[in-house]
Amino acid sequence: IAGKEAYLQGTVYCATKAAVDHLTKAMRMDLLPFGICVSAIAPGAAETEFSLVRFKGDSDQASAVYQGFTPLDAKDIADAVHFIVTRPPHVSIHDLVIMPAAQASATLFKKD
């Protein structure tokens, strides 16, 4: 989601994700004459090793990121990829934003 909206202390990360978003849009235009569809998936909070790396291996701090709500997992994203690649040839999914039900924006969560 960082490529769709900026957030505090995410300057470089959000900027690079926004660059990927525009690269994807440009590739979509460049590859259109060849019949190649280009899709982008923008996931919200997904429980991956990202938080562990972000907190330099501190597993307690990394786990705290996901406390109080159910984050996305790899299967959720894989299901989205499967949905995109199984569309009929006349259908192109350009952008798919996937968020946990408890997440309304990059920084707004409903936690238990």
What is the predicted role of each segment?
Residues 13, 21:
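Catalytic tyrosine of NAD(P)H-dependent dehydrogenase/reductases that use a Tyr as the general acid/base
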Residues 37-47:
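Conserved SDR Rossmann-fold cofactor-binding beta-strand/turn motif
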Residues 16:
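Active-site helix of classical SDR
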Residues 1-5, 45:
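Active-site segment of SDR-like NAD(P)-dependent oxidoreductases
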Residues 40-41, 60-106:
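C-terminal helical subdomain
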Residues 5-11:
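Active-site loop immediately N-terminal to the catalytic Tyr-X3-Lys motif
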Residues 29-33:
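Alpha-helical segment proximal to the catalytic Tyr-Lys
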Residues 51-60, 110-112:
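Short, flexible, mixed-charge acidic loops at enzyme active sites
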